[in-house]
């Protein structure tokens, strides 16, 4: 974005000009960035009305019994630890509605590979929602078990698909990002161990 200096007013905040949305630290994958204010405003509007298509791939602890489902719980800052997010009552101060749909891609006994589709985009949404069901993400040192898998580069969460209407042309744009090597290697290892 350096070459766009002077064309971005910092709609999302002075320290993040052009950034339409964020992904969690240690999450890999696709991110929407605008190169000018008009694009930023149009893309931010799509984000606010939840019309941007976002699918994440994740590996969760445990065996999810159903082939698909959803988590619909309000999220906000954890009152005991303000650095974390938590499921809150819908009338709690700062609580925001959040919806995560999920579908099982593969099962490996003690782990399940899932696709998560977001209707909302709250901080740590997938991580907190899945942890609230008893299936935190593999490698998640914040919301997962204390003995999380240290060999992973953070949680197994990847922004795989991203789709939106181009702000100038009106054309639907869809992108797909391959899994990063550490994530793909972990899936390969789980497949081998599960077959053994």
Placement of each model-derived feature along the sequence:
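RNA pseudouridine synthases
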Residues: 1-196
């Amino acid at each position: 974005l350096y070459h766009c200096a002077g064309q971005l007013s910092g709609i999302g905040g002075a320290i993040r000009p052009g950034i339409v949305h964020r992904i969690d630290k240690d999450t890999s994958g696709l991110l929407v960035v605008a190169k000018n204010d008009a694009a930023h405003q149009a893309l931010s509007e799509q984000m606010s009305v939840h019309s941007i298509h976002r699918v994440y791939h994740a590996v969760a602890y445990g065996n999810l019994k159903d082939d698909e489902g959803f988590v619909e719980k309000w999220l906000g800052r954890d009152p005991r630890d303000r650095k974390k997010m938590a499921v809150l009552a819908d009338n709690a101060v700062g609580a925001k509605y959040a919806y995560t749909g999920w579908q099982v891609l593969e099962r490996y006994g003690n782990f399940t590979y899932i696709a998560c589709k977001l209707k909302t985009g709250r901080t740590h949404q997938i991580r907190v929602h899945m942890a609230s069901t008893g299936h935190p993400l593999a490698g998640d040192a914040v919301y997962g078990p204390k003995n999380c898998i240290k060999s992973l580069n953070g949680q197994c969460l990847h922004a795989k698909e991203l789709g939106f209407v181009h702000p100038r042309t009106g054309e639907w744009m869809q992108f797909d990002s391959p899994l990063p090597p550490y994530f793909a290697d972990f899936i390969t290892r789980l497949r081998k161990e599960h077959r053994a």
